């Protein structure tokens, strides 16, 4: 730059500072220390707008322009001082520095990566994280030399490019003709403080979250001088404005010159407080406020939409997503009057089998958190997690580890159990006190680690629910107690869960699509940064619930003494505040407290009220409001807070009424074909299906390849509710026996008018039996709910179903025994083999004993209202099956012939059986039973499997005989309908308990021969009584440990309906199987409850993925059968 340009730049900058920064200059002049260095921060955008020519000079000649700025600033300060009339208390400062910030956002000036060689000499803004800070040194930047010949004194400045070394002058620079080359250094005798400055080197690293996948973060050194020294520490996020320069060490002969690129800082901006790195404008805030205004009547539906967008590549796992979202939202850090700081960050530990999606949650959380570090336990040491002492250039420096780098952010540690024992103890202080104290290599300091830790680990071998978490994952109690939540994900062997998960994965692989209802990752990042600025306060109601729950945990007999300390109450408060943030609220309400207690109960820290739950199979609730109501009833009753419960129920009723008035919706109106009554789109205030829901939706063309027979006017429903989305759940620890879940089922129960016997009936009988048997163990539990008091289905349908179920169960055992004797094939597992044996046994008996009826003309199913007080509407899966079999197609013949092919493997030997025929009835059909027990005891057996079957109309039955029912059986059934069923009810109810023990003993005796056979184990498991004193083989416990069935109360409501309805319905509906007379009820089989040592509750706080008839909008068995 020439003198004119320097003068222009100086004048423009001096006038700019005098106009815009006069107050800042006055504050500097008031300071008492005249030798200190004072910065004046100038915004580059405002300066360049004043004069664009300065911007051009600044970009081309940054070092010269910065020197001119400092000189102009001193002149401006002197002018301001002189302009004051009474400059009392003001003094002129010589060490003033202009600090440039706020560069225009463009690739030429703002960088997120380390600069390269082409950037040397340019003024840039670089963002990074401090990983190392050196000690502050004293730098001599100039010296005075005197010529020995002419005594001329001149100044020599240190060369920055050669590590601030001084080069002795080669000749005298005086204007006189002096050729002397000998000089004397005057600074050796007394180095003036004015010729020295503070000097510090730091090392910054690229931010990992801003890099592409697989990139290794690079680092570079930054030179800090004067007032910039000690402006940052290890782990800080910085935006550094400076000039990119290169430097090398002095040349040596036969040595390579090593040049490095450094950044000479002009201004350092610490971004820890505003670590989000994004600007929160009013438009974004308004968008989220409108979102919550839309879900004002049902805020949990809005929260679930956010949770569905959290890690969408993982299917279901509602509870885990809720816990991760609460941990990311974070609590509020408090500092009391004494200075004690209580952490606000929550810690989460995911314990689960391999392949349960733990690492996916860690990766997603690290992506949406602006300041995050992702590491693994096997590759981390104590120093790598905390801080490392590194010797560089002959001195020791501290290099920050993962926890320090994640200060005010998130630290994800995968394979947490791989940490060595002495490395685990090093993070105790970091997790609780939020600091790290270091005394290494003579360096003693304390660093902040205000970070949220999200860890994942595998259990040590097979997870044993009988042992504590500390034993299962081999972690000490002091470390586990620092985690606010510990969720267990058990990969139970569940066929339906595996089918849905594989279908979801394969569908996404073949047809990748992006749902419009899911939030993008940028939107999620913006939302979580926004809600961290909220500071919700606890209400009196929430305080009462949290305090009462803490007291219940302390008084629990099975409490963990290391866990139920005051840390538990602090964890509850943090999580409640986090949930209030997630719900975009400024007050912690009762809803937040109830949700936090529910999540805590489902984690391994809780369990004092209802026991734990397998978080893997929790599903998104179809009705979030109904789930919250159920949680309120369960928790507040356990906590004995009846007044709060009544008040909250009244509030929920008021909200429900308001939403119904805004959008009237009748749940009793039958859904139109092709839709689902429980579809979330039809509910007021509920969200539309997300990508995971749409991935479950099956249309007839997609599922059956166009071969599915559909009747006129009926089409297969293609919607999918959230239970179906989240899969299997039949391997869950808790039984789905919550009574609050039954009204939904009762609404969908139907009564089909007894019409003509059509081909649809017969086809449907066969198909529905296959589907019912394919459901396996789950069907028993769901059917037991259907017959609770006040929820009995139609009498005729019940009678037919009872008789067919009884004969089916007896023949199922017959088929299993015969197949065990005639065939020793152990290649099929028990859970897959039992449904096939049940099906083939019943088919074999019917096909060998029953004549084939002539086909009749198909008629459409007619649905007539049964009378007042009855609700109409067919359940979803029943309507689907009816729609499938209305028009018999080629599949019908193939399905009928399939049992014949399977039957070729087995040989059934019919034996003579004991029969019992009441008065006025013909002989019992010869295919009634194969178990030769006392005939006086068998008719009175009526166990849960017979009593718990759902209503079976023309659209669903449990027999495979179909169109092979004989006319002789029809006559027997008509005669049977005249027999009153009440004659056997008193004895049946009295002797039900003793008879179950008789059956159990007989089954144990009959199965001793094939003790090791898988099918025999499965049969004994099916045939065991529900008594808690029963002994189950150890092999079967591995499959049934996660099931829990509760038998319904034995009352008259479970008995058969009155005689009039029974006889009227039976006169129109012939039995679908070789059913015996009513009085001769046969023994049936049911699954056994887990032993008492597994302390699991039958009530669930969260929606478990139970694939019942109403939850699934499609039948997996039917779909798999139709595919070639």
Curated annotation (Swiss-Prot):
Residues 688-707, 955-976 have a biased composition (Polar residues). The modification Phosphoserine is found at residue 753. CDD domains: MCM9. Residues 1080-1089 have a biased composition (Low complexity). GO terms for biological process: DNA damage response; double-strand break repair via homologous recombination; female gamete generation; gamete generation; mismatch repair involved in maintenance of fidelity involved in DNA-dependent DNA replication; protein localization to chromatin; recombinational interstrand cross-link repair. Pfam families: MCM, MCM_lid, MCM_OB. It comes from Rattus norvegicus (Rat). This is DNA helicase MCM9. Component of the MCM8-MCM9 complex, a complex involved in the repair of double-stranded DNA breaks (DBSs) and DNA interstrand cross-links (ICLs) by homologous recombination (HR). Required for DNA resection by the MRE11-RAD50-NBN/NBS1 (MRN) complex by recruiting the MRN complex to the repair site and by promoting the complex nuclease activity. Probably by regulating the localization of the MRN complex, indirectly regulates the recruitment of downstream effector RAD51 to DNA damage sites including DBSs and ICLs. The lineage of its organism: Eukaryota, Metazoa, Chordata, Craniata, Vertebrata. GO terms for cellular component: chromosome; MCM8-MCM9 complex; nucleus.
């Amino acid at each position: 730059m020439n003198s004119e340009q320097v003068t222009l730049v100086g004048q423009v900058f001096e006038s700019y500072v005098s106009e815009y920064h006069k107050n800042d200059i006055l504050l500097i002049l008031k300071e008492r220390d005249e030798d200190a260095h004072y910065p004046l921060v100038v915004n580059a955008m405002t300066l360049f707008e004043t004069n664009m020519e300065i911007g051009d000079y600044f970009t081309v000649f940054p070092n010269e322009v910065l020197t001119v700025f400092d000189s102009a600033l001193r002149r401006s300060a002197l002018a301001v001082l002189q302009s004051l009339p009474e400059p009392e208390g003001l003094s002129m400062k010589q060490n003033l520095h202009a600090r440039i910030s706020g560069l225009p956002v463009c690739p030429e000036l703002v960088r997120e990566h380390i600069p390269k060689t082409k950037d040397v000499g340019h003024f840039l803004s670089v963002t990074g994280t401090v990983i190392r800070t050196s000690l502050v040194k004293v730098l001599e930047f100039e010296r005075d030399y005197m010529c020995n010949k002419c005594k001329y004194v001149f100044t020599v400045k240190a060369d920055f490019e050669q590590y601030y070394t001084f080069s002795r002058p080669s000749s005298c620079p005086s204007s006189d003709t002096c050729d002397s080359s000998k000089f004397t250094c005057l600074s050796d005798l007394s180095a003036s403080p004015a010729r020295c400055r503070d000097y510090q080197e730091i090392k910054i690293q690229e931010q990992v979250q801003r890099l592409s996948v697989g990139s290794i973060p690079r680092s570079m050194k930054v030179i800090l001088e004067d007032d910039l020294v000690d402006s940052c520490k290890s782990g800080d996020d910085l935006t550094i404005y400076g000039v990119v320069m290169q430097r090398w060490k002095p040349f040596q002969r036969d040595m390579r010159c090593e040049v490095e690129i450094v950044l000479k800082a002009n201004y350092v901006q610490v971004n820890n407080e505003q670590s989000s790195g994004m600007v929160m404008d009013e438009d974004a805030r308004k968008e989220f406020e409108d979102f919550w205004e839309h879900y004002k009547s049902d805020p949990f539906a809005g929260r679930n939409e956010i949770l569905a967008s959290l890690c969408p590549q993982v299917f279901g796992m509602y509870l885990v997503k809720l816990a991760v979202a609460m941990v990311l939202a974070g609590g509020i850090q408090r500092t009391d009057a004494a200075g004690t700081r209580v952490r606000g960050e929550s810690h989460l530990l995911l314990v689960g089998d391999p392949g349960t999606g733990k690492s996916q949650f860690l990766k997603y959380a690290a992506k949406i958190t602006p300041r995050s570090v992702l590491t693994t336990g096997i590759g981390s040491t104590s120093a790598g997690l905390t801080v490392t002492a590194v010797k560089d250039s002959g001195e020791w420096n501290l290099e920050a580890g993962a926890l320090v780098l994640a200060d005010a952010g998130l630290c994800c540690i995968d394979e947490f159990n791989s940490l060595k024992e002495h490395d685990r103890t090093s993070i105790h202080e970091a997790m609780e006190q939020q600091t790290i104290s270091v005394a290494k290599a003579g360096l003693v300091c304390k660093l902040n680690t205000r970070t949220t830790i999200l860890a994942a680990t595998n259990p040590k071998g097979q997870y044993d629910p009988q042992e504590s978490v500390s034993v299962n994952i081999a972690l000490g109690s002091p470390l586990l107690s620092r985690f606010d939540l510990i969720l267990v994900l058990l990969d139970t062997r569940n066929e339906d869960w595996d089918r849905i998960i594989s279908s979801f994965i394969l569908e996404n692989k073949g047809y990748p699509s992006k749902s419009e209802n899911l939030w993008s990752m940028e939107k999620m990042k913006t939302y979580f940064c926004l809600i961290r600025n909220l500071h919700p306060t606890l209400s009196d109601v929430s305080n009462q619930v949290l305090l009462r729950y803490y007291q219940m945990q302390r008084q629990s007999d099975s409490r963990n003494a290391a866990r139920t300390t005051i840390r538990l109450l602090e964890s509850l408060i943090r999580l409640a505040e986090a949930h209030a943030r997630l719900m975009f609220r400024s007050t912690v309400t009762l809803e937040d407290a109830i949700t936090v207690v529910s999540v805590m109960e489902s984690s391994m820290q809780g369990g004092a009220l209802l026991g734990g739950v397998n978080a893997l199979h929790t599903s998104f609730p179809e009705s979030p409001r109904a789930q919250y109501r159920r949680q309120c009833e369960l928790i507040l009753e356990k906590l004995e807070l009846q007044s709060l419960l009544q008040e909250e129920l009244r509030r929920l009723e008021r909200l429900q009424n308001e939403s119904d008035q805004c959008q009237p919706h009748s749940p009793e109106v039958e859904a139109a074909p092709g839709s689902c009554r429980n579809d979330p789109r039809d509910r007021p205030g509920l969200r539309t299906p997300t990508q995971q829901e749409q991935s479950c939706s099956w249309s007839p063309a997609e599922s059956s390849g166009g071969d599915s027979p559909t009747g006129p006017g009926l089409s297969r429903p293609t919607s999918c509710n959230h239970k179906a989305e989240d899969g299997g759940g039949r391997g869950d620890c808790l039984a789905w026996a919550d009574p609050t879940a039954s009204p939904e089922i009762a609404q969908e129960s139907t009564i089909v008018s007894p019409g003509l016997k059509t081909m649809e009936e017969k086809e449907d009988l066969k198909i529905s039996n296959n589907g019912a048997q394919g459901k396996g163990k789950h069907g028993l539990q769901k059917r037991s709910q259907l017959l609770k008091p006040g929820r009995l289905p139609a009498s005729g349908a019940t009678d037919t179903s009872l008789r067919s179920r009884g004969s089916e169960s007896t023949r199922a055992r017959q088929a299993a025994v015969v197949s065990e004797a005639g065939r020793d094939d152990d290649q099929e597992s028990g859970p897959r083999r039992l449904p096939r044996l049940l099906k083939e046994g019943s088919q074999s008996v019917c096909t060998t004993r029953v004549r084939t009826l002539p086909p009749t003309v198909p008629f459409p199913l007619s649905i007539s209202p049964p009378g007042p007080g009855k609700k109409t509407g067919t359940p979803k899966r029943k309507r689907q099956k009816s729609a499938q079999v209305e028009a018999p197609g080629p599949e019908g013949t193939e399905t009928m012939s399939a049992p014949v092919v399977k039957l070729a493997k087995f040989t059934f030997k019919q034996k003579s059986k004991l029969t019992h025929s009441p008065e006025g009835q013909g002989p019992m059909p010869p295919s009634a039973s194969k178990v030769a027990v006392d005939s006086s005891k068998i008719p009175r057996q009526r166990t849960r499997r017979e009593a718990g079957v759902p209503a079976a109309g023309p659209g669903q039955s449990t027999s495979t005989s179909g169109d092979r029912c004989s006319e002789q059986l029809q006559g027997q059934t008509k005669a049977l309908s005249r027999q009153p069923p009440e004659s056997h009810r008193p004895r049946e109810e009295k002797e039900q308990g003793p008879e179950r023990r008789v059956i159990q003993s007989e089954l144990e005796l009959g199965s001793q021969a094939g003790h090791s056979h898988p099918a025999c184990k499965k049969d004994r498991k099916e045939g065991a009584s529900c008594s808690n004193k029963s002994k189950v083989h150890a092999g079967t416990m591995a499959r049934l440990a996660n099931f829990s069935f509760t038998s319904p109360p034995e009352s008259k409501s479970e008995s058969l309906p009155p005689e009039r309805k029974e006889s009227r319905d039976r006169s129109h509906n012939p039995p679908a199987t070789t059913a015996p007379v009513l009085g001769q009820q046969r023994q049936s089989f049911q699954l056994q409850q887990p032993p008492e040592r597994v302390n699991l509750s039958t009530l669930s706080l969260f929606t478990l993925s139970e694939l019942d008839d109403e939850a699934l909008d499609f039948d997996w068995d039917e779909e798999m059968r139709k595919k070639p």
